[in-house]
Amino acid sequence: MAAAFRKAVKSRQREYRERSQPGFRKHLGLLEKKKDYKLRADDYRKKQEYLKALRKKALEKNPDEFYYKMTRVKLQDGVHIIKETKEEVTPEQLKLMRTQDVKYIEMKRVAEAKKIERLKSELHLLDFQGKQQNRHVFFFDTKKEVEQFDVAAHLQTAPELVDRVFNRPRIETLQKEKVKGVTNQTGLKRIAKERQKQYNCLTQRIEREKKLFVIAQKIQTRKDLMDKTQKVKVKKETVNSPAIYKFQSRRKR
């Protein structure tokens, strides 16, 4: 009965309406309600309490107080930042680690050198840029013989094969024997492409072997610098070479 009565009373109540901002105050925005004021007041009170606590802490601070965390924290732009701690390594451990690095790099360099030698033997590399080119010298008695000299006729081979330093058959050999291997244009292009790919791989391996050699030298130089012997820098370090130092000579017992 009471519940039905409350419902009947509520149905006859006037609808609650919030007062809106008057027209002459429209430029000030929406009219602040009680809930908006409460949020603003709570935020203001919270900030004031925080400032009050900071003032109290500053008044009660002991100028001689010390915490061990102070040795690991620095103030940067008003913010406390923990300093990065470096790993402590003894000189003996560091020297051993660098020795291991040198051994590993030297092992990789030797492996690259073996692969280079294998590729060179497979490609019959006689005129590669990384190796000094061979020279064939002809001797003559007169200047007229030099002017009339024909390399293809002297070597008894075709003019197209003169620039070769390997696989250069004579004309009589070409006339007697049949051409062995692939003769169609497609097959020749495929073989030339594969050969060029192997040459590119060889070039990359030679460059990698050189870089590993330079890295090993630089690591060895840094390892030698850990010695306490007096030293003088003779040449600065570059991309392709390590720094050169002159060490004080010591008499060995």
From Swiss-Prot:
Modified residues (Phosphoserine): S241
Compartments it resides in: Nucleus, Nucleolus
Domain of life, per lineage: Eukaryota
Main location: nucleus
Covalent cross-link Glycyl lysine isopeptide (Lys-Gly) (interchain with G-Cter in SUMO2), where: K74, K83, K86, K103, K120, K143, K144, K180, K211, K218, K235, K236, K246
GO biological processes: nervous system development; positive regulation of apoptotic process; ribosomal small subunit biogenesis; rRNA processing
Sequence segments annotated as region (Disordered): 1-21
Modified residues annotated as Phosphothreonine in this record: T90
PANTHER family in alphabetical order: U3 SMALL NUCLEOLAR RNA-ASSOCIATED PROTEIN 11, U3 SMALL NUCLEOLAR RNA-ASSOCIATED PROTEIN 11-RELATED
Assigned protein family: Belongs to the UTP11 family.
Listed name of the protein: Probable U3 small nucleolar RNA-associated protein 11
